């Protein structure tokens, strides 16, 4: 049971970035999404992370989207900026542009494609942390990056004062204990895997950076509140209801299914993505509809 809440905790949305028919960011739709999350009890927003299609937005578009999200949030919900890149210099540039913005934290992914060593990862995150006072959250997602940030490297990075936590998206719940042992109990552990998010909280994690939250925000917030209060049996009831969503929102590459689901629920006007991502295929749509019905959303 969590009695003292850390800087980041609970149900944190990995927010989709709505786009119009021309493939441009739809800021009117973005404002409505921010209001939806505030009304639903979401604990924080990650702007332009993986689910927010950061990889296909320019630096200028990323920064503008983060700043507009901050504007729409208006201090009512913390905003965490996705600032990761596989070039350390680019990640530093993004971070510096936000130094005086008011973001509550930065989420920085393990460099993808170039496959650095553990020492390379350490030096990468150290260099980013040294360019800012903004709290930094590491982001480990080997299925996308091709590299695994190991617990012992996390422990080294935890010695840097403004590296305060990790989004751990391996789905390996044993990482909770390993990272806590290496980095200390105060180091924030946020699951990046909806399917194992509640289990990680049972083992000492403080929350979930969630894809499911985009369309089931109130349920995810309630589940995490119950888990933080140690009411795991009640939290499990909600998690069971959402279990098909946790799985089928990854039936195709994220954020393809969740954007289509948000469109189906009327949360965004179009399910548009930027190439090379394309809209959810017709053969996958029935599975997502079934999962939405199981969750009581349709």
Swiss-Prot record:
Enzyme Commission numbers on file: 4.3.3.7
CDD domains registered for this protein in UniProt: DHDPS
Reactions performed catalytically: L-aspartate 4-semialdehyde + pyruvate = (2S,4S)-4-hydroxy-2,3,4,5-tetrahydrodipicolinate + H2O + H(+)
Database matches in PROSITE patterns: DHDPS_1, DHDPS_2
Positions marked as site (Part of a proton relay during catalysis): 50, 113
Residues binding pyruvate: 51, 209
GO cellular component assignments: cytosol
Gene3D superfamilies documented for this protein: Aldolase class I (3.20.20.70)
Gene Ontology terms, MF aspect: 4-hydroxy-tetrahydrodipicolinate synthase activity
Lineage top rank: taxon: Bacteria
Subunit relationships: Homotetramer; dimer of dimers.
Official protein name in the record: 4-hydroxy-tetrahydrodipicolinate synthase
Annotated source species: Histophilus somni (strain 2336)
């Amino acid at each position: 049971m969590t009695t003292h809440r850390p800087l980041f905790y609970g149900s944190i949305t990995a927010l989709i970035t709505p786009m119009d028919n021309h493939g441009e960011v739809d800021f009117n739709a973005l404002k409505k999404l921010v209001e939806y999350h505030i009304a639903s009890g979401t604990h924080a927003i990650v702007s332009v992370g993986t689910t927010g299609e950061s990889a296909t937005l320019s630096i200028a578009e990323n920064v503008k989207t983060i700043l507009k999200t901050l504007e729409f949030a208006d201090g009512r919900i913390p905003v965490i900026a996705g600032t990761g890149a596989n070039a350390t210099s680019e990640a530093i540039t993004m971070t510096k542009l936000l130094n005086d913005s008011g973001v509550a934290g930065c989420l920085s992914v393990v460099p993808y494609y170039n496959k650095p060593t553990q020492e390379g990862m350490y030096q990468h995150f150290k260099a980013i942390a040294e360019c800012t006072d903004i709290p930094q959250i590491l982001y480990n997602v080997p299925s996308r990056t091709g590299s695994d940030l190991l617990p012992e490297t996390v422990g080294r990075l935890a010695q840097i004062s403004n590296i305060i936590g990790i989004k751990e998206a391996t789905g390996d719940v044993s990482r909770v204990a390993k990272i806590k042992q290496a980095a200390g109990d105060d180091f924030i552990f946020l699951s990046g895997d909806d399917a194992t998010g509640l289990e990680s909280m049972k083992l000492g994690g403080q929350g979930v950076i969630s894809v499911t939250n985009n369309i089931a925000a109130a349920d995810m917030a309630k589940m995490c509140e119950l888990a933080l209060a140690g009411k795991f049996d009640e939290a499990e009831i909600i998690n069971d209801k959402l279990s098909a969503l946790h799985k089928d929102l990854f039936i195709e590459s994220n954020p393809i299914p969740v954007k289509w689901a948000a469109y189906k629920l009327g949360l965004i006007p179009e399910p548009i993505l930027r190439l090379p991502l394309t809209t959810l295929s017709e053969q996958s749509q029935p599975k997502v509809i079934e999962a939405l019905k199981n969750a009581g959303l349709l």
